[in-house]
């Protein structure tokens, strides 16, 4: 079992298989980076899987595949099958923008993927274009429909932004609700790579807008989930992810691995340790030691909240949020 210095059990590994993305979302990466990491610098799926086995043996029980956009990496379904075959009881999920999902959903399901988180920030094509930098909405919605059709469980993520999509929170909630998908509204996480024009809705503003349409009660946090959940009078639940809240980090159970082999204890901070050398050399003992060191050095909380809140210098497209 992996336990950090604040007595939090760390059992969730997020793996970014690529930093590349086919969107240029305003809140993440509106401009193309000066250069992508050369593909030869990325760990192969076999190397990533070697570390996955180490992590599972040390106590990891949930794995999420992220990017960038993970579906841009060729043969992703084969990597998922490696994990599933080794540990079929692992909670195996993926976060995607769904642009390429229609043609890949069945393969992912057959490989052992169980759940998806999909970003749907709007239901208006012109707003989707403004957010993502290209015409994406039809592909995204077609991908979601296909994922549901093949039996994948889907959650929706939405980042409400003033003067852009905030007026659509009810529409996207209803879209999700009618299809049996939980929606989580995510407060915009300030970072130096995002557009300077963005102003995100805070949770109190969001709740005030939703109360004009619904009655609901606060159910609090669901285990180690980053979402605070609310239950509507008809039983439907929606979540709000509040990185600025005092309780956001209290039960954090996750670490992140980049495609280059950097193991990151916290989304907010730049600090990381590399497992690349030990994995390439097949040194399982050394890789386990790095894993335990990263868990031991997880910070208590991020620095978004409070009067002295800071802007993160982390490139979220490298770590998958």
Curated annotation (Swiss-Prot):
PROSITE patterns: MOAA_NIFB_PQQE, RADICAL_SAM
Protein name per its UniProtKB record: GTP 3',8-cyclase
Residues annotated to bind GTP: 14, 64, 95, 155, 254-256
Residues in Radical SAM core domain copies: 5-227
Pathway: Cofactor biosynthesis; molybdopterin biosynthesis
GO terms classed as biological process: Mo-molybdopterin cofactor biosynthetic process
Binding positions ([4Fe-4S] cluster 2): 249, 252, 266
Binding sites annotated in the UniProt record for S-adenosyl-L-methionine: 27, 68, 119, 189
Organism: Sulfurimonas denitrificans (strain ATCC 33889 / DSM 1251) (Thiomicrospira denitrificans (strain ATCC 33889 / DSM 1251))
This protein's UniProt keywords: 4Fe-4S, GTP-binding, Iron, Iron-sulfur, Lyase, Metal-binding, Molybdenum cofactor biosynthesis, Nucleotide-binding, S-adenosyl-L-methionine
Source organism phylogeny: Bacteria, Pseudomonadati, Campylobacterota, Epsilonproteobacteria, Campylobacterales
Family: Belongs to the radical SAM superfamily. MoaA family.
């Amino acid at each position: 079992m992996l336990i950090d210095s604040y007595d939090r059990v760390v059992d969730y590994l997020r793996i970014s298989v690529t930093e590349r993305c086919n969107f240029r979302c305003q809140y993440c990466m509106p401009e193309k980076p000066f250069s992508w990491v050369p593909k030869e610098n990325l760990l192969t799926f076999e190397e990533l899987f070697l570390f996955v086995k180490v992590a599972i043996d040390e106590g990891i029980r949930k794995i999420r595949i992220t990017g960038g956009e993970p579906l841009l990496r060729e043969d992703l379904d084969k990597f998922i099958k490696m994990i599933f075959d080794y540990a079929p009881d692992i909670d195996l999920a993926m976060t995607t923008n769904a642009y390429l999902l229609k043609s890949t959903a069945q393969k992912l399901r057959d490989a052992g993927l169980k759940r998806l988180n999909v970003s749907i920030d709007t239901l208006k094509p012109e707003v989707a274009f403004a957010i993502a930098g290209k015409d994406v909405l039809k592909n995204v919605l077609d991908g979601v429909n296909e994922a549901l059709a093949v039996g994948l469980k889907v959650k929706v993520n939405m980042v409400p932004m003033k003067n852009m999509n905030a007026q659509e929170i009810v529409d996207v909630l209803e879209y999700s609700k009618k299809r049996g998908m939980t929606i989580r509204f995510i407060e915009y996480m300030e970072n130096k790579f995002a557009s300077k024009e963005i102003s995100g809705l805070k949770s109190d503003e969001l709740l005030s807008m939703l109360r004009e349409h619904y009655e609901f009660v606060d159910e609090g946090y669901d285990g180690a989930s980053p979402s605070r959940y609310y239950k509507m009078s008809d039983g439907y639940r929606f979540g709000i992810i509040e990185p600025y809240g005092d309780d956001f980090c209290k039960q954090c159970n996750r670490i992140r691995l980049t495609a280059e082999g950097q193991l990151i204890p916290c989304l907010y901070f730049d600090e990381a340790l590399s497992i690349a050398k030990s994995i390439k050399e097949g040194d399982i003992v050394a890789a386990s030691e790095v894993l335990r060191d990263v868990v031991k050095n997880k910070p208590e909380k991020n620095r978004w909240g409070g009067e002295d809140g800071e802007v993160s210098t982390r490139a979220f497209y490298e770590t998958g949020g």
